[in-house]
């Protein structure tokens, strides 16, 4: 079974770059695929596991005691440095608060203007709808109040005009 560098790295719990570095450092002979990537077999993986174990043992050194951080920075006591920076921090903080308030105010203004425009559009639509309703009601009333015309009530069929109708039909 042949494995790629990333597969071996996952198996050993190290990065692919570490695998490549070990291959170069220890001159491990490997085959390459057509893309130039290393191909590892089980024997090589076992060798790399041994390298990892040896590297891990060599890397494990006795822990060095941690020293407390030095209280001086550039020969200036931290308290003095803190005192000199504190007014600047307060100024920046107040400016930030002011900018946040301005931003909120602008956002509120934009929303208010948008609501005003939407309200005006809605009022225009309602006015148009009311006018259309009135027009429809007036037309219905006119239709109901209109006396029936003579041509609508006659039950007699129209007499056909023979010659002129045919000639006129040709031009229509």
Curated annotation (Swiss-Prot):
Protein location: Cytoplasm
Residue ranges flagged as DNA-binding region: 5-25
Stretches with biased composition (Pro residues): 62-71
Gene Ontology BP annotations: asymmetric cell division; chromosome condensation; chromosome segregation; regulation of DNA-templated transcription; sporulation resulting in formation of a cellular spore
Coiled-coil segments: 83-146
Domain of life: Bacteria
Keyword Cell cycle set for record: yes
Entry similarity comment: Belongs to the RacA family.
Stated name of the protein: Chromosome-anchoring protein RacA
């Amino acid at each position: 079974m042949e494995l790629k560098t990333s597969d071996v790295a996952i198996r050993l719990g190290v990065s692919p770059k570490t695998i490549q570095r070990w291959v170069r450092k220890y001159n491990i002979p490997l085959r390459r695929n057509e893309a130039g990537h290393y191909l590892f077999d089980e024997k090589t993986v076992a060798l790399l596991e041994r390298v990892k174990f040896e590297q891990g043992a060599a890397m494990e050194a006795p822990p060095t005691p941690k020293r407390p951080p030095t209280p001086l920075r550039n020969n200036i006591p931290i308290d003095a440095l803190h005192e000199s920076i504190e007014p600047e921090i307060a100024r920046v903080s107040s400016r930030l608060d002011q900018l946040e308030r301005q931003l909120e105010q602008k956002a509120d203004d934009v929303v208010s203007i948008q609501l005003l425009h939407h309200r005006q559009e809605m009022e225009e639509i309602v006015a148009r709808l009311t006018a259309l309703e009135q027009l429809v009601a007036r037309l219905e009333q006119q239709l109901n109040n209109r006396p029936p015309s003579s041509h609508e009530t006659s039950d007699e069929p129209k007499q056909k005009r023979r010659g002129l109708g045919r000639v006129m039909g040709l031009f229509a």
